[in-house]
């Protein structure tokens, strides 16, 4: 090892005796933390020696002494770079911070560089130091280098006080300037070096290291971070280690870093040139492939004589030609051409190309400017509607009005006003089987338009209406767009079937999506999520069908024109069965028109006694069953065609009637009244039964059964309170209610019921119970009752009167304020019923209860049943 060179210092140097830990082709600068693998014998021996023997030092170089570990100094080693087997003259004093085992086995030591040092002369190992690398102290080895561990003098160099050895730090002292000037120069060099290092680290994406470097304020510490730099050679790092002067270190680092950045710029320029060349070659390859495809298509066209099948239909050029030739709105054409441009830039193997082609096919398939010519022959349109459906005059009149208005607009040249055309949104509400769905086809045929049915029952995904966004795999347009594409025109009749069966879940609310579709003020600019272009729906005739209006949100119902289909009369059912149902079922049974003849009396019996519904589905099923019986008897030889069926023959084919008038039987006893109600299947007859508990065994209060809702329970309470407060006026023994409980029951018990219209029926039943006068068997009633006895209006009058007519009742009591609703009731039903319009409960009781006779006239007294009902005029 070379002798210690001369170093000019301002005070006495600090000399320590430390074990040498050689580093092959590596340099540790002060401030660096390194992990040393102790599988190397020299490394392990040096670490063990430092930990067992410590270091020796003295502030006076002329009288050095050895201090023990007990003095508090941490275990230190001298990290000496070794290049080509030779130890360098400069080294780093390192503190052993931790020794431990590695996860994969073996051990390692964590050493932190603390100061620069010059390597001095060889010293004997301290007493008690392990010099063999085995970790066992040998008390007899007090001199020499030991077996594997060398101890030397380490002259610690102070960056702030020392002048580097040799020519590295101007040994002649020619550099002028005060300490303040030197500090300013060092700060300037540090800022410049920090900027270069930060730029280099940002290029590499080492953002965490950038933050660490930016946090260093000491110039010397900043310069020593160069020990981590991979672009510096070992010789350059040794030169930095031997340069205590901070300014000189920073100058050299600036020179080396700038040279490295220049090399990086040249390498980046070369890489960019190579990449541009590759891109140019790839672009040229794609263009040549497209040119070959165009030439191939041209040659095929020439060979086929210009036939339409020559084009592939899947190439971007073909899509561009189709878009330019199609009759598209300007905004749609611009969007389609933009997608064609994307398709031309897309690789054939990219899945995006398939998505673009699907979108273009959808756009090109839509009939953007195709509209069916409306049939303005109003008389012919009405004839079509009458031929397909009996009754339903409200709907037919509305369609005729729509056609008349469109013809008027066409004559006046008002096809489009404010961007909107003359479409309509109608809601057909009514019980099942009244012909709501089939009516849509008849309307389309009468108007000369195409018809599309969109089934919405059970739909819970908002995307089913507005479409899926194209970012999703397998995206499709919504049902409205698909219906327009299927119809082939922009003004079809679209039937939104079962709109009240829509549901909502985590995927959205389809009814909210329908708000834009069915709003005449918005649907001329409808935007499907898949198409993302405006679609004009203002010329579409939307027909929405529903059974229960309460299930439709109010904002959606507000956007539709409501038309109620309350059901058919018995005569209308007979006409429908004779003109439509019978012919259809004859075909399904394989019978000719003259093989089976069903008389009108038999059809009346089927409609009134074997079925009792608002629609005609059960009636059609009964006809089908009847014809099957006939076919079976013919096959068995029990009958021969042709067969004529009258009302008396039905029992032999279908058994006894299922529905017979029961009002007379139920109301024969006091306490039972007949009411009218509206259900999801139309109108129905409702019976209210009341009874009084025995005075000795029954408790007080009122008991309500029959799955009654809150409103219906309140109606019973109001009825009882009214009778208690007006019992004297009505000549009713209300004193019996003091200690006798009242029970009100509304069959059938398994069916939930609610609503205010049963109030008058409950009042009549309780009055009948208290007076002992039965309710007339031919009377039905409906209306809400107040505490003062006023009869208030209710809804569903048409359906309730149809139900009363079906049940064979002849007298109906209605609130006075429901008089205008009688205009909606079919004339045959109005003529068959005696309708009394009442305003007070007293009128109801006078009309509904059987008259009471005293004993002097030989009749019954109050509290007993007996005499037959007497008809009363309104």
Swiss-Prot record:
Reactions mediated catalytically: Hydrolysis of proteins in presence of ATP
Gene Ontology MF terms in the entry: ATP binding; ATP hydrolysis activity; ATP-dependent peptidase activity; sequence-specific DNA binding; serine-type endopeptidase activity
Induction annotation: By heat shock.
Principal cellular location given in the protein's record: cytoplasm
One GO-annotated biological process of the protein: cellular response to heat
Annotated EC: 3.4.21.53
UniProt keyword terms in alphabetical order: ATP-binding, Cytoplasm, Hydrolase, Nucleotide-binding, Protease, Serine protease, Stress response
GO annotations of cellular component type: cytoplasm
Record-annotated active site: 757, 800
Low complexity compositional bias, start-end: 124-142
Locations listed in the record: Cytoplasm
Binding site for ATP: 430-437
InterPro entries, sorted: AAA+_ATPase, ATPase_AAA_core, Lon_bac, Lon_bac/euk-typ, Lon_lid, Lon_proteolytic, Lon_Prtase, Lon_prtase_N
Transmembrane residue ranges: none
Gene3D superfamilies, per the entry: 1.10.8.60, 1.20.5.5270, 1.20.58.1480, 3.30.230.10, LON domain-like (2.30.130.40), P-loop containing nucleotide triphosphate hydrolases (3.40.50.300)
Disordered: annotated segments: 47-68, 120-144, 298-318, 853-874
First-level EC class: hydrolase
Family: Belongs to the peptidase S16 family.
Function comment: ATP-dependent serine protease that mediates the selective degradation of mutant and abnormal proteins as well as certain short-lived regulatory proteins. Required for cellular homeostasis and for survival from DNA damage and developmental changes induced by stress. Degrades polypeptides processively to yield small peptide fragments that are 5 to 10 amino acids long. Binds to DNA in a double-stranded, site-specific manner.
Assembly description: Homohexamer. Organized in a ring with a central cavity.
PANTHER family: ATP DEPENDENT LON PROTEASE FAMILY MEMBER
Protein name stated in the entry: Lon protease
